[in-house]
Amino acid sequence: WANQNHALGYGDDPWTEGAVRKIRETFTADCEPLFVFNGTGSNVVALQLMTRPYQSILCAETAHIYVDECGSPVKMTGCQIRPVATPDGKLTPELIRPYLHGFGDQHHSQPGAVYLSQCTELGTVYTPDELKAITLLAHQYGMRVHMDGARIANACAALRLSLKELTVDCGIDVLSFGGTKNGLMMGECV
């Protein structure tokens, strides 16, 4: 069909509409998917939507946004990235708490978001209970939680859980779904 007929661009085509419908069914959430070209773009768009330039983003010291994305998240969001040392690539409330200061002080970056990778860059996986503990703490401090789901299908398989059970049900605010590493030909979705 795509090579034989005309389709409107900019999301007004049957393929985009079908993808949006499937995403909403999968997550059973009122969400507005944004399709982007690659993982860095997905993370940057997600973090831009969640933060303001005077804020900071907390992440594991091994996190993709800190180690591998060539400073794009810092450049595009204006936020400071605050790496947190972890023994296994996973953040915990106990590891996050020491970074929860400076709120209301114009001389300090205000913690605005927590970034998680599922699976982590070290191959570890967050359980729903671990995710809920992090999102609860973050939300208590008015912060949002972003999940980089470049390899989330592996976490779903390892834990035998659905995408919804590892995101929406755990309080994750924004997911960057990695299409390429999760079985699609190309592209990502916020």
What are the residue ranges of the model-derived segments?
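Conserved PLP-enzyme active-site core in the AAT-like
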Residues: 1-190
